[in-house]
Curated annotation (Swiss-Prot):
The keyword Cytoplasm does not apply. Pfam families: RecO_C, RecO_N. It comes from Xylella fastidiosa (strain 9a5c). This is DNA repair protein RecO. Involved in DNA repair and RecF pathway recombination.
Length: 243
């Protein structure tokens, strides 16, 4: 299959044999693709190598045969965000999440748009934690494993004042005992779950519980094996708060 003048976001790049690269990209029309960029060493290929960087928005042409395609041409369409600190780690996170959870060639229409929006939010570091929760919700929905965030697992409308455990398969379940502090820590309020369902920015105090709840769901779908970016973010936060 010939792919011509398609736009994509670069997710990951790694060496492939001696002079080539394996480039993972996210497209709206074809989903995630793995492309081999051959012979990219040398001064003449400097512009191409510069375009094949994570977060870069590109236009490319390729020949797709089997699992991996052959990249024929690529050019940068804008300047990729220059990130640092938590915003940079967040970019590693969304890219790693896509690579681990989204199979190649699967349809990703809405997820492509969500990635584009999240990329711009990373550029400004605007509501970073909230942006990541929205992206996580979108990736779960794309995979067909999302759930109704307006009602609990029994179909009862969520109570904003109640805390819920997010069951990876069935969705929100009411926390039965408020006295179990260990379980309470890993729950989300009905208020923040409703906000996530309705794209409404919630109270900042609710975001930590939502982060832990969504991570538990994602960890289930990751087969129990966590992400390298989670470890990097945890180390960064520890270093940032250390005396």
């Amino acid at each position: 299959m010939l792919i011509e003048h398609e736009v994509a976001f670069v997710l990951h790049v790694r060496p492939w044999r001696e002079t080539s690269l394996l480039v993972e990209v996210l497209t709206q029309a074809y989903g995630r693709l793995g492309l081999i960029a051959r012979g990219v060493q040398g001064l003449k290929k400097q512009t191409l190598r510069a375009a094949l960087q994570p977060l870069q928005w590109i236009r490319f042409s390729a020949i797709q045969r089997g699992e991996l395609g052959q990249l024929r041409q690529a050019e940068a369409l804008d300047t990729a965000p220059r990130l640092k600190g938590e915003a940079m780690l967040a970019s590693f996170y969304i890219n790693e999440l896509l690579l681990r959870l989204v199979p190649r060639h699967a349809p990703v229409n809405e997820l492509y748009l969500a990635y584009s929006q999240t990329r711009e939010r990373l550029r400004t570091s605007d509501s970073l934690a909230w942006s990541l929760r929205l992206f996580e919700r979108e990736i779960l929905e794309t995979l067909g494993v999302g759930f109704n965030l307006e009602c609990d697992a029994n179909g009862t409308p969520l109570d904003p004042a109640t805390r819920y455990v997010l069951d990876p398969l069935e969705g929100p379940r009411r926390l039965l005992s408020e006295h179990n502090n260990a379980k309470r820590r890993d729950t989300a309020t009905g208020h923040v779950l409703l906000a996530l369902a309705r794209n409404q920015i919630p109270n900042t105090n609710d975001l930590a519980g939502l982060r832990r709840s969504m991570r538990a769901v994602l960890l289930h779908h990751l087969g129990g094996r966590g992400l390298k970016s989670w470890e990097m973010i945890a180390a960064f936060r520890h270093q940032d708060t250390s005396p």
